[in-house]
């Protein structure tokens, strides 16, 4: 799946910066993106997004100093300069893009105010789906941030084709510094959504035996609303080399080591257990999964660990535990 990311505001720009870094490291060329902000210092702090892909807006209004957590001003500035933003996106190439993904912290001013405006215009111009990843502030960040998030989310859900939510308060660790906390949370976002948005892409090892392509992801997300993502991992230990290899259950994550190479029914049981842990574990947005309308199961790992029976049974288990009957994978 080829994705064009737009990082809106400080939080969104940092996350897109990490997606671009991950894409360069993996040499997959699945992602491209730009960062949009009203604060010059936030744009200068990015490391992997090229300078030409950093767009400063609202200079005549806020003179490069940001909107000061005022999302009304953020929305107005975005509307005034929407042509510049669309031109910046179009000049980077959109002919082979499968989806647009807007990433923003919903508690601030630029991202929370501008994201719904941009989503509306992207949907008007392009045929590809427009998704959003909204980062919710923790309650202790202050009432203003919570108010901004509530107002922005209600609008963003209506404008985007589907909205993923990452709830900071559900992922915080006590005693962690602010810098360490944000770095860890951003890393969790990139790890989880990186698996999802790379569905169907061909890696160095070639095409997998069982492939979930971009159309299955798009069809799962069709219909709008809010989505949450889980992620789980189980490590395989090679008895000869004694080196760990990851077995990822795509939408989901948590580490657990095993000292055996499993075969037959054991492989099937391992996959089912992995999907269960992913769905029952920590989701990006804690929720009652039994009310979900649709589901998608993504598995990635070495071919000798991919048991078709296990994959089918895990999909059946998800189908039995959600309200809807649409489960792809």
List each language-model region with its residue ranges.
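Tubulin/FtsZ superfamily GTPase core signature
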Residues: 1-329
């Amino acid at each position: 799946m080829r994705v064009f990311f737009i990082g809106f505001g400080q939080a969104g720009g940092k996350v897109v910066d990490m997606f671009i870094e991950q894409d360069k490291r993996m040499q997959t060329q699945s992602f491209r993106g730009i960062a949009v902000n009203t604060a010059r210092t936030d744009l200068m702090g990015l490391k992997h997004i090229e300078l030409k892909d950093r767009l400063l807006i609202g200079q005549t209004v806020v003179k490069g100093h940001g909107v000061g957590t005022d999302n009304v001003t953020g929305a107005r500035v975005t509307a005034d300069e929407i042509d510049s933003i669309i031109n910046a996106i179009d000049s980077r190439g959109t002919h082979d893009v499968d989806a647009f993904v807007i990433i923003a912290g919903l508690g601030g001013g630029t991202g929370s105010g501008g994201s719904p405006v941009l989503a509306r215009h992207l949907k008007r111009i392009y045929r590809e789906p427009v998704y959003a990843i909204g980062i919710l502030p923790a309650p202790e960040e202050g009432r203003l941030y919570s108010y901004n998030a509530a107002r922005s989310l209600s609008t963003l859900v209506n404008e985007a084709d589907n909205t993923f939510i990452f709830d900071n308060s559900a992922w915080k660790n006590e005693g962690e510094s602010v810098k360490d906390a944000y770095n860890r949370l951003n890393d969790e976002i990139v790890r989880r959504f990186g698996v999802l948005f790379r569905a169907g892409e061909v890696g160095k090892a070639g095409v997998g035996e069982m492939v979930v392509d971009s159309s299955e992801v798009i069809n799962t997300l069709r219909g709008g609303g809010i989505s949450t993502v889980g992620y789980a991992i189980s490590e395989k230990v090679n008895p000869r080399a004694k080196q760990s290899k990851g077995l990822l259950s795509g939408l989901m994550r948590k580490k657990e080591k095993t000292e055996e190479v499993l075969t037959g029914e054991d492989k099937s049981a391992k996959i089912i257990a992995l999907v269960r842990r992913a769905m029952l574990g920590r989701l990006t947005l804690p929720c009652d999964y039994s009310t979900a309308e649709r589901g998608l199961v993504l598995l990635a790992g070495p071919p000798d660990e991919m048991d078709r029976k296990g994959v089918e049974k895990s999909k059946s288990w998800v189908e039995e535990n959600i309200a809807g009957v649409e489960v792809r994978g």
